[in-house]
Amino acid sequence: MYALTNCKIYTGNDVLVKHAVIINGDKIEAVCPIESLPSEMNVVDLNGANLSPGFIDLQLNGCGGVMFNDEITAETIDTMHKANLKSGCTSFLPTLITSSDENMRQAIAAAREYQAKYPNQSLGLHLEGPYLNVMKKGIHSVDFIRPSDDTMIDTICANSDVIAKVTLAPENNKPEHIEKLVKAGIVVSIGHTNATYSEARKSFESGITFATHLFNAMTPMVGREPGVVGAIYDTPEVYAGIIADGFHVDYANIRIAHKIKGEKLVLVTDATAPAGAEMDYFIFVGKKVYYRDGKCVDENGTLGGSALTMIEAVQNTVEHVGIALDEALRMATLYPAKAIGVDEKLGRIKKGMIANLTVFDRDFNVKATVVNGQYEQN
């Protein structure tokens, strides 16, 4: 048992000073005033840094020089996790983009192997595709985009303990498939979609509760057709992920989206291999993607994921969007936890929660993380 002291604590509800967080095993034992700490308690002095719940990234294709699609193994997930810790992300959804059924099965096996060893780190796969709309494919390979079929939907449902989320284009897939996934406990997200406003609204009735990278690879909101963006704005209960790197979405649009969506707006990175690594290019599902000036683009200039980290997403949200730090932190912790239904154990600093925490200074440098109660200095 030990206590984290001399820090500003962002609990998810309050901002506390002159308090300590006591950690026992893998859980938070208590949050208490500093004067009530037992004198014999082991103490870690955080030198006035900020302490928040560990960041939760619901869309991570790769980082630290590796891509999940490129090498679909538990080792790749582990490399991603270790790279994440440098930027304060303690839990994430390894994201497999559009690929073959065989690769999807491989990803399920890799996720199962990793999650059996390491709880509360990978929270389940995010299958981004292949059930998308070719019109909004982005970097996804047209060779593998296809409608959902009964066999694979059954396979996905049978492995719902290691699959957290599926992104699909509802206009190209059966509502029964969406309903089946939802019934199995999987979050279904609208994305890479050319749906109209009314098609999107219908899909929310089928059980879709999330939207993948708001504004990107979806029909925009225009005067006579509100599109998918309008449908998301018009449906308060639907969550939306947003990429706050300054390239995918204008910061003013993030500010407007936050005014409308509030606690349903979630920071995601959609990161690729260059996040937390030094590299000029990488291969993304057989395509060469170049990393230049913070941007990841293919030879046609199509964005191929980001090089964003979660701490940078929080910093950009505070400094460029103008959202207060405590709310920006909730967008990276509590709201994603709620979106995938893990907020009973992650996303807040309070008694009984899993001790996944992030320590960062006023300049947004991550100083340390706590994962399952284990304190690790950066």
Curated annotation (Swiss-Prot):
Q: Which GO terms describe its molecular function?
A: metal ion binding; N-acetylglucosamine-6-phosphate deacetylase activity
| Oxidoreductase recorded as keyword | no
> What EC number(s) has UniProt assigned to this enzyme?
3.5.1.25
Active-site residues, Swiss-Prot/TrEMBL: 270
Cofactor binding, note field:
Binds 1 divalent metal cation per subunit. Ni(2+) ion is seen in the structure.
Reactions the enzyme catalyzes = N-acetyl-D-glucosamine 6-phosphate + H2O = D-glucosamine 6-phosphate + acetate
Q: What disulfide bonds does the UniProt entry report for this chain?
A: none
**Which Gene3D superfamilies does the entry mention?**
Metal-dependent hydrolases, Urease, subunit C, domain 1
User: Which cofactors are reported in the record for this sequence?
Assistant: a divalent metal cation
Q: Which residues cross the membrane?
A: none
Task: Provide the residue positions that the database annotates as binding substrate.
Answer: 139-140, 216-217, 224, 245-248, 303-305
Entry keywords, A to Z? Carbohydrate metabolism, Hydrolase, Metal-binding, Nickel
The UniProt entry, under PANTHER family, shows: N-ACETYLGLUCOSAMINE-6-PHOSPHATE DEACETYLASE
Q: How does it assemble?
A: Homodimer.
Into which family does the record put it?
A: Belongs to the metallo-dependent hydrolases superfamily. NagA family.
* Role noted for this protein: Involved in the first committed step in the biosynthesis of amino-sugar-nucleotides. Catalyzes the hydrolysis of the N-acetyl group of N-acetylglucosamine-6-phosphate (GlcNAc-6-P) to yield glucosamine 6-phosphate and acetate.
Q: Write down what this protein is called.
A: N-acetylglucosamine-6-phosphate deacetylase
Q: Which organism is it from?
A: Vibrio cholerae serotype O1 (strain ATCC 39315 / El Tor Inaba N16961)
Lineage, uppermost ranks: Bacteria, Pseudomonadati, Pseudomonadota, Gammaproteobacteria, Vibrionales
Chain's gene name: nagA
